[in-house]
Design a protein with these regions (language model features):
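A short, N-terminal "cap"/entry segment at the start of jelly-roll beta-barrel domains
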Residues: 1-45
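Conserved short histidine dyad/triad with adjacent acidic residue
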Residues: 42-62, 96-97
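Conserved hydrophobic/aromatic beta-strand scaffold that supports enzyme active sites
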Residues: 48-50, 67, 92
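Short, conserved beta-strand element in jelly-roll/cupin
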Residues: 53, 62-77
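Short acidic-glycine-tyrosine-enriched beta hairpin
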Residues: 81-97
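A short hydrophobic beta-strand segment most commonly corresponding to one strand
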Residues: 94, 107-116
Length: 116
């Protein structure tokens, strides 16, 4: 039986978390963009972690829902056929399954994410 009283795993400070090199961003549409991250928890369908990426343009078509909370940096997200919106530190967004559009990362971005 799973102990639901324990709070694990735990990350005290997403801004200071040590990240692993995750290599180049496959979704990049310009110069290569480098990513790093830390997976806090995953179960095969859902995942929680910290992700960081260098500046540049990218294009996404999401196959899952994604919740993001920006820790540092800023980017402009533009859904296909929609309006651009800038997201920066302290802001939160949800990208529903099927969301498609571009992310223009202006400054190295670090986000806490939940894929579900």
């Amino acid at each position: 039986m799973t102990d639901i009283t324990a709070v694990t795993p735990f990350l005290a400070d997403a801004a200071a978390a040590e990240l692993e090199d995750w290599g180049p961003l496959e979704e990049a549409t310009g110069e290569p963009m480098q990513t790093a991250g830390y997976t806090l928890w995953q179960d095969g369908e859902q995942e929680v972690g910290v992700w960081e990426c260098t500046p540049g343009p990218s294009y996404w078509k999401l196959e899952t829902h994604e919740f993001v909370h920006i820790v540092s940096g800023r980017m402009t997200v533009t859904p296909d056929g929609g309006e651009a919106r800038e997201i920066g530190p302290g802001q939160t967004a949800v990208f529903p399954r099927g969301w498609a559009g571009s992310w223009q990362i202006h400054e190295k971005i670090r986000k806490v994410y939940v894929i579900f």
